[in-house]
Amino acid sequence: MKRTFASILLCAAGLCSALDAGAAGPQKDSVKTTFQSSREWRPTIDNRADAVMVYGVGGNPSDKNRKGFTFEERVKSWRDRGYITHFMTGIAWGEYQDYFTGKWDGKWHLDEGQVTVKGDTIWHGHMVPYIVPSENYLKYMKEQHVKRVIDAGINSIFMEEPEFWARAGYSEAFKREWKEYYGFDWRPQHESPENTYLANKLKYYLYYRALNEVFTYAKEYGKSKGMDIKCYVPTHSLVNYSQWQIVSPEASLASLPCVDGYIAQVWTGTSREPNYFNGKAAERVFETAYLEYGSMESMTAPTGRKMFFLTDPIEDWPRDWVDYKHNYEATFTAQLLYPNIADYEIMPWPERIYEGLYKVSPDSDKKDRIPRHYSTQMQVMVNTLNFMPESSNKVTGTKGISILMSNSLMFQRFPTHQGYDDPQLSNFYGQALPLLKRGVPVKTAHIENLGFKEALANTEVLLMSYSNMKPLDPVAHEHLAAWVKKGGVILYSGRDNDPFQTVQEWWNTGDNHYEAASDHLFGLMGIPAGAEEGEYKYGKGTVYIMRADPKEYVLTAGGDKKFLDTVCRLYSEKAKAGKVEFKNSFYLERGPYDIVAVMNESVSDAPYTVTGTLIDLFDPQLPVLKSKDITPGYCGYFMDLDRVKKDGPKVLAASNRTYDEEVSKNSYSYVSKSPVHTTGISRVLLPARPSSVLVNGTEVFDAGNWDNDSMTYLLTYENNPDGVSVKFVW
């Protein structure tokens, strides 16, 4: 092993000079919208994003009824339709049977799967194990996959989901990696917290190494062919991986020179994972999605890496179209509440969305393809992402309250020890949901990023706990102490009696003899080890210690009162940042768009009223409204025509994408494209009431479709991926 685990984390914190040169960030590409598909182009899935990530040299392991298209043929089919073509595949699993069965190098490699304590391999699909990424496997990935896609002219590579299951760690392949990494024999992770911590640090390192090696090779091989290869990591959020008990390198990758960016893989499937609030476990899709997207933004923002936000109109688990629609609106709204992110993966697997059969309602066994009203709404929504601006506007609510996170959140989830449990990641949600549910747009900050001055630049009060994570390097504490000394405020929650406090780590080895990791931080600020609950001054700042684990704030009804009272007092009296405002909604004005979320389980059941000259973008009929009430548990998405430049005719909202626009003194024409078997609907701004509306040369003008107040015409027709020609005359 050439680099220690601690050195990896130092680099992730912006403290490694070799990586700092890369941390300024490479040039971002021009792709704003993209999607992933393992299929060749076909008219039913032609969603008209800027780019497509063609999935897998051999496709997706779950593909059925393949038609035998080669990778190169699939790429060509999309290029012929005007798409920029990129490549995506899994780094932890994939269509790699030629490796597992020995076709590649003459040796079977099924023993390199991730294995549980019972000796069972963890499978992603038939003959598709989750992998312990050995050096031999990485050689295979470079030679058989990366080289081939670059030879096909692909210049952007997405290696998704670097995942090592927390319950794995018992295979012979893992034992070999353990011996090489630590220099001593493997130890079963279930036998002690120490072993669990060691095992999970190794899992973290193995996929850090894997992506570093594969991406470095991709860039070097591309350079030899005169190509500038971009490399991205599509990954779940730290919130989700921690909750699902998966270990992944996450934040440390952002500072690697070979990593150009990420896709934040957040969707209904991740965000509906139940969590606790006010003593009740429940799905809270909007709130969880908001925290997931936030953790991805804060993880990369200081590094300048490109970030795509993903949403999915359905999910992996078969449910019904009513469920899919409601939760898609929630996750879609959550992503838009981050105005500094404006690049999107608009959907994964359009073949599954447009061609899959799902229940028409929760109380019906009938299955059908996506309803017309939902495909129309979905296409209107994703088409707006092609024009979504970044914005300096902020979400409504009290600013400056952040929750500290660490990659080590993933290290303490499984197995449990000494009876200490953290149900559904409640030590994290216990700091987040009491505020978020009351309309406070809490942010997250990553301990690995504290070396970047931007990490805490907008934080007034930092909430932290070591009950569910540990600092992986003492340097982070130096940054925190310096921040407090200059006037920062920390609210530390923790009994510091979880079993991972005693693992052999930097705070209790060598010259350090601290019983709890927090005692090292406290010592830097003149606070005694094991300090009692209370308030402590350091420099211009304040530390308040609450001797309760954050899970206690949400596992029982009303358990968050003292926590909330303390946060509010620290914010107003110590940070002197004003009064913490409680409400049941979030609102953001983003260019011409209004984004609204109204929460249940909050401070009131009052609706949020949006006013203006509004196109309702969640309504497939695109009505123009003067106001609309959004009730708790629902979201709203609107274009306000009062904020649209009236500088000529234009398509304002549509379920198709517009090309070849031409404007003359008394006419406006264009070509629209979208998948077959879907409804085309457009609300078009015009300088005057039209006298003629032509669709493919046929007159379709209907006076009832003209709205004089908004000066817009509502046009509908059948979509066509080959193009529909439209012309307005006035």
What function would you assign to each model-found segment?
Residues Q27-S37, H86-G90, F158-P162, Y197-I246, ...:
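Aromatic-lined carbohydrate-recognition surfaces of secreted/lumenal glycan-active proteins
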Residues D29-S77, R81-I84, K147-I157, P257-Y262, ...:
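Catalytic domains of carbohydrate-active enzymes, especially glycoside hydrolases
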Residues T44-D50, Y55-G56, E160, G222, ...:
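Hydrophobic targeting/anchoring helices
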